[in-house]
Each structure stands twice: as C-alpha cells, then as structure tokens.
Amino acid sequence: MPNILPGPLRGFGVTFGTMFRRVTTEQYPDEKKPTMPRYHGRHVLNRHPDGLEKCIGCELCAWACPADAIYVEGADNTEEERYSPGERYGRVYQINYLRCIFCGYCIEACPTRALTMSNEYELADDNRADLIYTKEQLLAPLAPGMEPPPHPMRLGDTKDYYRGTPAAHMLSGEDDAASETTLDRSDDHSATYEEAERP
C-alpha cells in the first residue's frame, strides 16, 4: 500500500510556515496602494488656461490606437462658436474602455498634449455601455479662472496657445519681450485631472 502521508504533511508544513510571515494581502478597497506617478490610468482631455480645449480634432490618437478604442469626430471652429484655438476642435470624442489596453500610444501621438493619462484605475462597471466614455466625461474640470467654451481666444493668437506663453503674462499685458518666454511641459498650467475631481 503506497504511503500517502508525506504529500499532505508537506502541504500542512507550507501552511504552518506561512502563518508566521508578514501578511502581504491588502485590504482593498479600504486600503488603496498609491500608484506610481507615470501610471497609465483613465484618460483626461486637457484645457488651456482660459478654458479652451486643447484637442484640435486631428484624430491622430485614434489612428495610433492599436485596439481601435478611440473615436474622434472633428468640426470647424467659428469666431461665434470657438471651442479650441486654431481651425478645428474635437466635436465628438469617445474612448471605449472595453477595448483600451492603456498602452499610451495615443498620448505620444497627440501634437498638442491634449490627451494625458491620470492615476485613476477604478473603471469597473456592470454595464458595458457605461464604459464608453464621452468627451464630457473625459474633459478636465474647469479650474478657477477658466471660462467654459465656446468663447473667443483670451490669451493671444493661435501661436501663443501652442507655444505655451504664460497665461499670467497674457492676461496682465506685460511687455512684449516677456511674451517670448515659453513653458516647459512640466510647468503646464492647464487644467488636469489632479486639479479637481471628476464630477
């Protein structure tokens, strides 16, 4: 008759040994581990300091997406109804989080840094339709001092917006020499997800 005791005894030995080790289980969602600064979470459509949208409706993010998770439909700005600097804006913007693999290719493809990724990772839902995020859900909330579009360009011409001329200088009307100053991306004053919680 084969000896069946060594196997179960070895199993109990492993169990007994782990009883005295430090617990590695995290009590989620009561205890949430902070994410790394460059974590790829939910997308955010950023704004310029006066509230205009950075998205120009070029669709490069949609073309770069390997999962075909992004749908963009651009439209023309008019002086009476302006949503972004320049000629066009993203009239329709959707991200399907049932498809998205959070690779970040869309972020790299964006020419105006309109699209960035936040640290939000709690996207689970019991309704598939609710995981197709619309432009209204993705837009960064208006920070203090911002005006909801549509409205005219408040910070100069299109070049001033895309060069990142400091908004404080443009609004205060200081000398033109200072207008040549540009901002590094790390000092971007645009509204991002971290400035206000999603409604």
From Swiss-Prot:
[4Fe-4S] cluster 2 binds at C65, C100, C103, C106. It is found in: Cell membrane. It is a peripheral membrane protein. SUPFAM superfamilies: 4Fe-4S ferredoxins. Disulfide bonds: none annotated. GO terms for biological process: aerobic respiration. Keywords: 4Fe-4S, Cell membrane, Iron, Iron-sulfur, Membrane, Metal-binding, NAD, Quinone, Repeat, Translocase, Ubiquinone. One of its GO terms (molecular function) is NADH:ubiquinone reductase (non-electrogenic) activity. Its EC number is 7.1.1.-. It is an enzyme of class 7 (translocase). It holds the Pfam family Fer4_7. Residues 45-75, 91-120 form the 4Fe-4S ferredoxin-type domain. Binds 2 [4Fe-4S] clusters per subunit. It comes from the Bacteria. Residues 164-199 are annotated as: Disordered. It catalyses: a quinone + NADH + 5 H(+)(in) = a quinol + NAD(+) + 4 H(+)(out). GO terms for cellular component: plasma membrane. NDH-1 is composed of 14 different subunits. Subunits NuoA, H, J, K, L, M, N constitute the membrane sector of the complex. Belongs to the complex I 23 kDa subunit family. This is NADH-quinone oxidoreductase subunit I. It comes from Acidothermus cellulolyticus (strain ATCC 43068 / DSM 8971 / 11B). The lineage of its organism: Bacteria, Bacillati, Actinomycetota, Actinomycetes, Acidothermales. The gene is nuoI.
